[in-house]
């Protein structure tokens, strides 16, 4: 308690009033801190909104450029289909370039980024990817001779390292055939020449009977000798035996062999070499 003298007022500090003032100060400080926090948060959100707006604007521009490029590609495809009516499997690279030139002349300069797509398209194209596929094994033509061998054409050439193999020759060579025939004929002629003396010795016609031995009458007249009687019987049976004809001798001489030269003994004896 403070006492003032004279005409001064007597003032006294109340503790409740002091507590009330302290609370007000604390509330003011807390409100200020809260306002500052909200302000900082609002500033951060505003900056984030501005960055998002910039990104959105860039994306809108990119979408517009892509839409313009898509429209240009659609017009190019339409003009290409009208100028070059062909299938995708049978397209060719030179015709494709001509169509692209005509399409560029009709459509004018393309949008931004068209050259990069064009270069990528040319990089992915290969020389043999657009040409029509050739048949693997061409069949025989009706006007070709059946005796000639058809040589299969190489299909789908993969590179310079791949070499077409020559066709296998099915028919035997005439030189080998002639040599084989000559050797077989020489062997058969040598066999015929070896067998000819034995055949002539076996199939020789019976010789005519010689003149009677001077002792024949003596042997036949002596009935006491049995060996002479046996020899006379053999001679008589040989005389009464009929002689074989020439055709029969030829039939005996000819051997039933499948080889054609056995039927001609003159050719077999001459030993003809082919």
Curated annotation (Swiss-Prot):
SUPFAM superfamilies: Leucine zipper domain (SSF57959)
Residue ranges constituting the bZIP domain according to the UniProt record: 17-80
Keyword list, A-Z: Activator, Differentiation, DNA-binding, Nucleus, Transcription, Transcription regulation
Any single GO BP term: integrated stress response signaling
Record-level Gene Ontology MF annotations: DNA-binding transcription factor activity, RNA polymerase II-specific; RNA polymerase II cis-regulatory region sequence-specific DNA binding
Region span, Leucine-zipper: 45-66
CDD domains: bZIP_BATF
Chain segments carrying region Basic motif: 20-41
Coiled-coil boundaries: none
Compartment(s): Nucleus
Segments of this protein annotated with the region Disordered: 1-47, 128-151, 187-229
Any one annotated GO CC term: chromatin
Low complexity bias spans: 187-196
Highest taxon of the lineage: Eukaryota
Subunit structure: Heterodimer; heterodimerizes with JUN family proteins.
Family from the record: Belongs to the bZIP family.
Stated role: AP-1 family transcription factor that controls the differentiation of lineage-specific cells in the immune system. Following infection, participates in the differentiation of CD8(+) thymic conventional dendritic cells in the immune system. Acts via the formation of a heterodimer with JUN family proteins that recognizes and binds DNA sequence 5'-TGA[CG]TCA-3' and regulates expression of target genes.
Protein name: Basic leucine zipper transcriptional factor ATF-like 2
Gene name of the record: BATF2
């Amino acid at each position: 308690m403070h006492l003032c003298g004279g005409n001064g007022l007597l003032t006294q500090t109340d503790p409740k009033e002091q507590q009330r003032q302290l609370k007000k100060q604390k509330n003011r400080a807390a409100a200020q801190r809260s306002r500052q926090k909200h302000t900082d948060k609002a500033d951060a959100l505003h900056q984030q909104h501005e960055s998002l707006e910039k990104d959105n604007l860039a994306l809108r521009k990119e979408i517009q450029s892509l839409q313009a490029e898509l429209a240009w590609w659609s017009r190019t495809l339409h003009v290409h289909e009208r100028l070059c009516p062909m299938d995708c499997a049978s397209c060719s690279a030179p015709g494709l370039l001509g169509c692209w030139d005509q399409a560029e002349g009709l459509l004018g300069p393309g949008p931004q980024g068209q050259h990069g797509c064009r270069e990528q398209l040319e990089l992915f194209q290969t020389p043999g990817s657009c040409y029509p596929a050739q048949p693997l094994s061409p069949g025989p033509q009706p006007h070709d001779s059946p005796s000639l061998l058809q040589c299969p054409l190489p299909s789908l050439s993969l590179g310079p390292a791949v070499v077409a193999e020559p066709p296998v020759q099915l028919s035997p060579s005439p030189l080998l055939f002639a040599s084989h025939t000559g050797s077989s004929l020489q062997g058969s002629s040598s066999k015929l020449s070896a067998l000819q003396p034995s055949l002539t010795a076996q199939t020789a016609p019976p010789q005519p009977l010689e003149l009677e031995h001077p002792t024949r009458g003596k042997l036949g007249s002596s009935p006491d000798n049995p060996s002479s009687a046996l020899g006379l019987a053999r001679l008589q049976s040989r005389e009464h035996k009929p002689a074989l004809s020439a055709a029969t001798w030829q039939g005996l001489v000819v051997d039933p062999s499948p080889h054609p030269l056995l039927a001609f003994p003159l050719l077999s004896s001459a030993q003809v070499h082919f």
